[in-house]
């Protein structure tokens, strides 16, 4: 469960290392975001000499959360960290690689480009 002021790791090579959520895209009064939701975030830590810089406002899709994700078949998935992938206005990732495992539910939300770049889909 991601809410405003939550810090997230970045799971791609776009140049950002850490994000802070400032808004959840969707309904006007949503409190929490889960896997597959789009957030507006500010870059808190960035790699030097990369296109994305610190204090830049970006959109990102959440790919991992510490909060459990319960599937219809009864399986429960929990990750060790909160992570997101930086995306553009069309929903395509800004980076060319994805690090770490991501949830299969992203395919249902039409993030097929992110799923195809991921090394492991759980």
Swiss-Prot record:
Keywords: Chloroplast, Plastid, Ribonucleoprotein, Ribosomal protein, RNA-binding, rRNA-binding
A single BP term in Gene Ontology: translation
Domain of life: Eukaryota
Coiled coil (UniProt feature): none
Pfam families the record matches: Ribosomal_L14
Subunit structure: Part of the 50S ribosomal subunit.
Protein's name according to its UniProt entry: Large ribosomal subunit protein uL14c
Organism in which the protein naturally occurs: Ipomoea purpurea
């Amino acid at each position: 469960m991601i809410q405003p002021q939550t810090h997230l790791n970045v799971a791609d090579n776009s140049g950002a290392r850490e994000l802070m959520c400032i808004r959840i895209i969707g309904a006007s009064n949503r409190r929490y975001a889960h896997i597959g939701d789009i957030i507006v975030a500010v870059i808190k830590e960035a790699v030097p000499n990369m296109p994305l810089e610190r204090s830049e406002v970006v959109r990102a899709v959440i790919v991992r959360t510490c909060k459990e994700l319960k599937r219809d078949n009864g399986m429960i998935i929990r990750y060790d960290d909160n992570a997101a992938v930086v995306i553009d206005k069309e929903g395509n990732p800004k980076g060319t690689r994805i690090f770490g495992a991501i949830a299969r539910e992203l395919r249902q939300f039409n993030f097929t480009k992110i799923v195809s770049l991921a090394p492991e889909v759980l």
